């Protein structure tokens, strides 16, 4: 069976870490991420409550949520990312992580809240996005909140048609997802910059109405839509606060 296109993130993690970088994604020291999570936890009374993170990456949110007193469970399809996050979270007894395909693997337990940090936009086909969002919705207890943080966003010009495959998306965008490109990654240990060649990975941005329609079709209630300032993590993004 052909592996899913979003396994490109596993290949990227492997390449970046083998080049000597310690961190690719968010850091627990990201002030915007920390302050957003702190406010979200406090407003929803999530201390000592269970939170699942989809596409948890290297565990930055896990550290922050653990420090805020939450019971954390992170999942990601990348074994390399899970290895990194497990090491980062080893001193937090209420934090666990596991390899899981958030599109295909169902979540058996019900959680008090959920978070997705730059995860949804990794999915480009309509079917994968719908399957994942339904999975996330069904993992939540009634009236539980979910935060989609820094999802790729454009005010206009996004593709509103149906996308059925990664090949179809590549034709629509004209982007090259095969040729490695030079990227610079700041090493978390000593602050030096590591240069690495990695291909562009597929990502699908939506406008405000596109996101709202997508969430409401699953059953989520939209509480807040926030356009984020540009960051080194992603230039154009939005954070969407929803509730089951």
How should each PLM-predicted stretch be described?
Residues 1-46, 57-70, 75-93, 99-104, ...:
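Class I (Rossmann-like) S-adenosyl-L-methionine-dependent methyltransferase catalytic domain
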Residues 54:
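Conserved beta-strand/loop positions that form the S-adenosyl-L-methionine
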Residues 111-112:
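Local beta-strand N-terminus motif with an aromatic residue
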Residues 118-122:
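Short catalytic micro-motifs in class I SAM-dependent methyltransferases
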Residues 125-127:
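Conserved catalytic-core motifs of eukaryotic protein kinase domains, centered on the activation segment
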Residues 130-142:
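A short glycine-rich, Lys/Arg-flanked "PGG" loop and its adjoining helix->strand segment in the class I
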